Swiss-Prot record:
Cellular component terms per the entry's GO annotation: plasma membrane
Organism field: Gluconobacter japonicus
Extent of the signal sequence: 1-45
The keyword Cell membrane is assigned to this record: yes
Post-translational modification (record): Predicted to be exported by the Tat system. The position of the signal peptide cleavage has not been experimentally proven.
Protein name: Fructose dehydrogenase small subunit
Main location, first listed in the record: membrane
Lineage: Bacteria, Pseudomonadati, Pseudomonadota, Alphaproteobacteria, Acetobacterales
Keywords: Cell membrane, Membrane, Signal
GO biological process: fructose metabolic process
Amino acid sequence: MEKIADSGPVQIFLSRRKLLAFSGASLTVAAIGAPSKGSTQDVVASNRDSISDFMQLSAFATGHKNLDLNIGSALLLAFEAQKHDFSTQIKALREHITKNNYQDVEALDAAMKDDPLHPTLIQIIRAWYSGVIEDETNAKVYAFEKALMYQPSRDVVVIPTYAHNGPNYWVSEPASVDVMPAF
């Protein structure tokens, strides 16, 4: 009988020099790749300020005070990805509203017809009412059932969907049957 050679685990030749070089390289990559705590906090704080500015401007522009913060955050991120100077446009719009003491969006709209910030105002209003920021066929939807255009008639009009009783209809309890039908 012949002995079959053992094909055990592959031997790894690791010398002290290789171990030291590998450890040093790993520590260097970890130190360079990790962001500092201060910079992360600054980004979060500035993002919080821009979300607050966007939500306040949105409340003024739409006339709705109880806007969904999650939808607002998603819309803001989408606008900022589309236009890199969007945050400065928001600040400029808020300063314009404060400086001229506009009471409602209709007065602001009438005064800003030829202003370069007018399209930004219209885009914000349109995004909250339609739930999208683009006109394309495959545009990303940020708000569907919570889009503002469905809110005034949500008790009588079913939101367009393939689900016959509206989105998430299966979540609520079905209506109880008081009298059983007779066949």
